[in-house]
């Protein structure tokens, strides 16, 4: 598949590893091994052509929407990147695994990832430049306990981390909005463990995020974020 082993995907690996051919090649081989482990070519056949939205009908979509809602494609940035939105206060990590189990969550995630990578590939070809993802993570009213699910952590380590590593260089920017003070302190410690390329892309913003987001997206896209259920326009 061109979006899996074509020039654009190879370029993502090169850029993601600062143009180090040995590191990029090792990561690319790891990606192929991960794809083989999860039979992702079969997933690609079924889901790569499906638009990557919260209404796409991926496996177990209803359960995911109940327990881990958001906008997988809220719109597009002024420069053509995909904008996604995740309101973490609404994410119930233990509940979703109790609801559908690890295998079903993995089935959903694989389908969504193949759809996402195909989406970015198509946009890159249309725009003549590498399309990426702008992720808006909303910490409004978040409680620390919501982020500490041991069961989810085990599932994530066993499955999603390797899958995420296979999607090298897809992030253009991460905006963490409505960031409380405790999260700022936590991030100051965490960022030293992050790859420098990743840390450069993360921007923490308080409740006055509107002006900054309008530098990268239009009013319509921002409106979908601010108008998300429970946001009350702020």
Go through each PLM region and give its residues.
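Basic, amphipathic alpha-helical/coil surface patches used to engage anionic, phosphate-bearing ligands
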Residues: 1-234
């Amino acid at each position: 598949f061109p979006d899996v082993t074509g020039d654009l995907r190879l370029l993502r690996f090169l850029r993601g590893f600062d143009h180090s051919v040995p590191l990029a090649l090792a990561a690319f081989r790891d990606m192929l091994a991960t794809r083989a482990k999860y039979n992702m070519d079969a997933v690609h056949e079924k889901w790569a052509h499906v638009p990557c939205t919260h209404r796409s009908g991926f496996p177990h979509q209803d359960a995911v929407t109940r327990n881990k809602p958001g906008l997988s494609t809220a719109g597009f940035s002024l420069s053509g990147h995909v904008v996604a939105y995740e309101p973490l206060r609404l994410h119930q990590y233990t509940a979703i695994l109790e609801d559908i189990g690890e295998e079903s969550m993995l089935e959903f995630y694989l389908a969504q990832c193949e759809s996402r990578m195909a989406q970015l590939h198509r946009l890159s070809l249309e725009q003549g430049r590498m399309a990426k993802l702008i992720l808006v993570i909303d910490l409004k009213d978040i409680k620390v306990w919501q982020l500490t699910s041991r069961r989810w952590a085990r599932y994530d380590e066993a499955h999603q981390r390797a899958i995420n590593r296979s999607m090298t260089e897809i992030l253009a920017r991460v905006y963490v909005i409505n960031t409380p003070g405790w999260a700022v302190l936590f991030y100051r410690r965490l960022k030293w463990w992050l790859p420098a390329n990743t840390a450069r892309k993360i921007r923490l913003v308080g409740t006055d995020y509107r002006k900054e987001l309008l530098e990268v997206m239009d009013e319509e896209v921002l409106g979908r974020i601010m108008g998300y259920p429970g946001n009350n326009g702020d």
